[in-house]
């Protein structure tokens, strides 16, 4: 009950043949149902639906998933994730299937709930805007490995790894006109035949001679900012 998860597409995670209330009740029965009557479990499910901003909670309790909008279905999934008061909520692209307006509402909801239940959220996303808005600490991955991590300010204002630098250069900036957005050259390595050197080397425009060696170890740029790149090994040797 310590870890809970919110998935990307609620329509594929909710069972289409069971009512919302039945599915919410089952979560509570399996994980937090000891000593609770059916009435108590129903009341808790309705309470959770209200907590995530569903006004007609008793009506939604009786509905099937197909009767709800995408945003409402995702709110139901969030309610089910909160059923056991988890310490960590893993949110895997929870707003990808939603339009921009509903996405903003769901992000606000998650932020408020995090503080309300004193929980932490591990947010998995490709959306840099969502990261900038939601994250306190950011871990950047490339081809399955962590290449840089730091506070949101460090990652966005002082990117260190060439891949992260490329990401920041490729995003549009308000008030700045460009003929063409930057695009990182090359392709991601084949996961079946990964190289034994830095996975980004073949796409990197900042390679140094050392990059031909083994996969680089992590280097600390600050107490919170760390990067796996040979370009910063001089700093590692100084430390």
Q: Residue locations for each model-derived region?
A:
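Short catalytic/signature loops enriched in Gly
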Residues: 55-58, 149-239
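ABC nucleotide-binding domain signature
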Residues: 1-8, 122, 197
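Conserved ABC ATPase signature
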Residues: 63-68, 72
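P-loop NTP-binding/switch modules centered on Walker-like glycine-rich loops
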Residues: 90-94, 98-179
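A short, proline-enriched helix->beta-strand linker immediately N-terminal to the Walker B motif
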Residues: 83-87
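ABC-type ATPase nucleotide-binding domains, specifically the catalytic core motifs of the NBD
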Residues: 22-40, 50, 150
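Conserved ABC ATPase "signature" region
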Residues: 39-59, 168-169
